[in-house]
């Protein structure tokens, strides 16, 4: 997972450096961006061609790995988050199960597999914890199987009584 994480961070930051967004390029507006975005932009400036090439190689290997999995499975399923919703005053979780989150977005690591695969992904409700906080499950389908994934999602939602659960949120 660490290789995928490094790949995703590199490609994300590289994408920011190629953004036409004038807020990123203008020092007067860049300073007004939140510190996490400024950090991303600063990190992006350190990306070497070797690091970028390695990220693309990692993504290619991941694409091949996930594509091979679809030889055995119609869909892949993962949690849609590593933590339940947290207090709005908290910027982000800094630790999950005694594992330090190294960046402001590391707590979302579980979604990068689907993102990097290029496959269609959908997140659906999975249930609630004892504090009525929702959790989801992400389903990943093979490339080109968007319709199949949407049909599955519809059947999933029709088969489970989520409407009743949603009505209980906040009670």
Model feature map: region roles:
Residues 2-14, 86-93:
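Short glycine/threonine-rich loop-to-helix capping motif typified by GTGT followed
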Residues 10-67, 79, 83-84, 123-126, ...:
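Short helix-loop capping/hinge segments that flank enzyme active sites or metal/cofactor-binding pockets
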Residues 15-32, 105-108, 145-158:
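Short, basic, helix/turn surface patches
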Residues 39, 63, 92, 107-110:
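Tryptophan-centric aromatic hotspots in well-structured domains and transmembrane helices
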Residues 53, 64, 72, 115-171:
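Structural helix-boundary/capping segments
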Residues 54, 86-107:
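Short, surface-exposed loop/helix-turn segments at secondary-structure junctions
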Residues 104-117:
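Hydrophobic alpha-helical segments in the ANL/AMP-binding
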């Amino acid at each position: 997972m660490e290789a995928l994480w490094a790949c995703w961070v590199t490609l994300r930051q590289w994408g920011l450096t190629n953004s036409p967004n004038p807020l990123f390029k203008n020092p007067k507006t860049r300073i007004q961006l939140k510190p996490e975005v400024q950090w991303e932009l600063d990190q992006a400036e350190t990306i070497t061609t070797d690091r970028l090439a390695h990220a693309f190689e990692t993504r290619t290997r991941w694409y091949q790995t996930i594509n091979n999995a679809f030889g055995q499975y119609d869909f892949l399923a993962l949690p849609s988050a590593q933590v339940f919703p947290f207090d709005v005053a908290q910027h982000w979780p800094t630790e999950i199960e005694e594992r330090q989150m190294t960046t402001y977005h590391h707590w979302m690591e579980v979604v990068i597999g689907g993102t990097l695969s290029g496959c269609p992904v959908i997140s659906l409700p999975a249930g609630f914890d004892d504090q009525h906080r929702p959790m989801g499950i992400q389903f990943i389908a093979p490339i080109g199987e968007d319709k199949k994934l949407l049909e599955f999602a519809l059947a999933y939602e029709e088969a489970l009584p989520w409407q009743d659960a949603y009505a209980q949120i906040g009670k």
